[in-house]
């Protein structure tokens, strides 16, 4: 699939809080899930089970991945999220290598700075990584 244009991802504060809460609850392991997005604005955060149960990687459980694909088929934009408990909100080489959905946004929640979590968005396609601006607020 061709590399699609980048967009701004708007995350209402309540959903941002939910992403951060999930990351904190699962630490020291990475958390993961997906976000239903419409017209560039996140509408719902859906937690998934990290099949890897690891601080160094994630894998969405099959049921969640199937549900995210169904949203895509229904015309929603999809964001996959995961956390980096001890590193920046930037894709690791493993994240890049395993990114299998070039038209989805990859959101990374970093807890590296303790009380100042960071959420950043990325488009990853064919090894190319481009940041998608994330705007927090209603």
Language model: regions and residue ranges:
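Conserved beta-strand-loop surface patch within small alpha/beta domains used
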Residues: 1-77, 86-138
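Conserved, mostly hydrophobic/aromatic
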Residues: 80
């Amino acid at each position: 699939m061709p590399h699609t244009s980048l967009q701004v991802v708007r995350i209402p504060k309540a959903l941002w809080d939910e992403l951060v809460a999930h990351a904190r609850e699962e630490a020291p392991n990475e958390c993961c899930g997906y976000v239903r997005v419409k017209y560039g604005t996140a509408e719902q955060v859906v937690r998934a089970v990290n099949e890897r149960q690891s601080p160094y990687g994630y894998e969405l459980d099959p049921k969640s991945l199937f549900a995210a694909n169904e949203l895509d088929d229904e015309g929603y934009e999809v964001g996959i999220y995961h956390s980096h408990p001890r590193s920046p909100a930037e894709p690791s080489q493993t994240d890049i290598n395993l990114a299998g959905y070039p038209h989805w946004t990859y959101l990374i929640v970093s807890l590296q700075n303790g009380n100042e979590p960071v959420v950043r968005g990325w488009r990853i396609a064919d090894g190319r990584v481009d940041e998608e601006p994330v705007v927090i607020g209603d």
